[in-house]
Amino acid sequence: MQHFFYKLILSYDGTFYCGYQKQPQKKTVQQTFEKALKKMTHQNIPTFAASRTDKGVHSQGQTLHFQTTFSLKPKHFQKTLNYLLPPDIRVRQMHFATPNFHARYSAKSKIYQYVFSKKPLNAFNHHFQIFADKFDFVKITKALKFIEGTHNFFAFTSETQPKNFSKTIFQASLKETVHKYILVFHGNGFLKYMIRFLVGSLIEIGKNKFSLEQFQAMLLGNKTKKATLLAPAKALVLKKIFY
């Protein structure tokens, strides 16, 4: 029986989901997507994603792959899935994939963004931003430069088991628009809660509660101090996966 391989880019508002990955008795993005996929194909099809985003984290560029005996042109597949999915989950692109493509293991790098509002939050942005209340973004910009390069990020993850805590960050920068400050992180991979702990430390630096020297020392892999402030999930978005 012939199998067909598909790759797709998924966007979602993570506000009302317990993260991306399936969990027993919990509403997740993966569970919701696979339910729509089953309704369409009448098959139980496992899907594989590039990133297991946390509860409340959003995506504009999550990449998935799956294989099935169900044959349909990708554009028609995409249209039907979007009809079956709730409005806070959308298939942005869908293509045929090669049999050796893997959404997670074929990925070369990822871009995440963390968004601050310059003004108090309102009904239209409070699920997607946090308020930048009296932050020193000059200091934050200096701290961002320390993040670039290859470092041991043990101090910025909840993971404690023996493993390689080394990651390479190609870009850690600040973009400013009329209404927002946007932190951009482009790296070859990220540990659990790594970006949110980094942002939490940057917030403390921006509020003069934490020094640049202390932050730089933590990036040397010093295991005597861990980041303590976990930035809210709602302002974090997975922007793009590179292959």
UniProtKB/Swiss-Prot annotation:
Its EC number is 5.4.99.12. Keywords: Isomerase, tRNA processing. It catalyses: uridine(38/39/40) in tRNA = pseudouridine(38/39/40) in tRNA. One of its GO terms (biological process) is tRNA pseudouridine synthesis. InterPro entries: PsdUridine_synth_cat_dom_sf, PsdUridine_synth_TruA, PsdUridine_synth_TruA_a/b_dom, PsdUridine_synth_TruA_C, TruA/RsuA/RluB/E/F_N. The keyword tRNA processing applies. One of its GO terms (molecular function) is tRNA pseudouridine(38-40) synthase activity. The keyword Isomerase applies. Substrate binds at residue 112. The active site is at 54 (nucleophile). Homodimer. PANTHER family: PSEUDOURIDYLATE SYNTHASE, TRNA PSEUDOURIDINE SYNTHASE-LIKE 1. Belongs to the tRNA pseudouridine synthase TruA family. Formation of pseudouridine at positions 38, 39 and 40 in the anticodon stem and loop of transfer RNAs. This is tRNA pseudouridine synthase A.
